[in-house]
Amino acid sequence: IGFASEAVGRVIPTHSTGSLMLDLVCGSGDRAGFPEGRILEIYGPESAGKTTVCLLAIAARQQEEDQKELADPTYNKKLCIYLDAEHALDLRIAEEYGVNLNELILIDPVTSEDALDVVDELIRSGQIAIMVVDSVPALIPSSVEKASYNQQFMAVLARFMSNVMQKIIGPAHTNGTTIIFINQIREKPGAWSPTG
């Protein structure tokens, strides 16, 4: 606890998004790109390029980690996680965007709770640079799987996401893990689509 004036000089490290234009939109100079240790949400309509932005950010961060390791052979480089809740990631496309699949942890969850327990442990290890969650509507808690989709799906998902945020926001900040949630814009708030 302290006065905000004491923290004025504090700089939040940023990392390239993999796109110069997006870096500049997110900041300027040495503050361009996605902030380290923060939670971000990329949202938009289906096929708007949300996954592409995330794959480019992963590729850029992997290259940055490679450069750090080249400069200092004792450096323990961080990895990236792609939590594919939609079960739709095309790994060939990821590779075309420059993602090193040998250094990408892919989580293809059966239930969201199981996946997020693993993710929480990995983030707390301090060895994760970026985690992408694709996508928020596909994070189906087991309580929803067992129930009818008519039983207030959106309310259950909102409570689940609130619990997720409470669990990961502190460790992500402490360990410098950038977490990117992909979300979609819907015309009908109850509708769900496994793409986007």
Model-derived features: where do they sit?
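Short amphipathic alpha-helices and their capping/turn segments at secondary-structure boundaries
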Residues: A115-M131, I168
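Conserved P-loop NTPase "ATPase switch" module shared by AAA+ and STAND
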Residues: Q127-E145
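Loop/turn-to-beta-strand initiation segments
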Residues: K77-L79, Q127-I130, T174-F181
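Amphipathic alpha-helical transducer elements in NTP-driven molecular machines
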Residues: H15-S19, E36, T51-L55, P109-D117, ...
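A short beta-strand-to-loop transition that corresponds to the Sensor-1 phosphate-sensing loop
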Residues: D84-E86, S135-V136, F181-R186
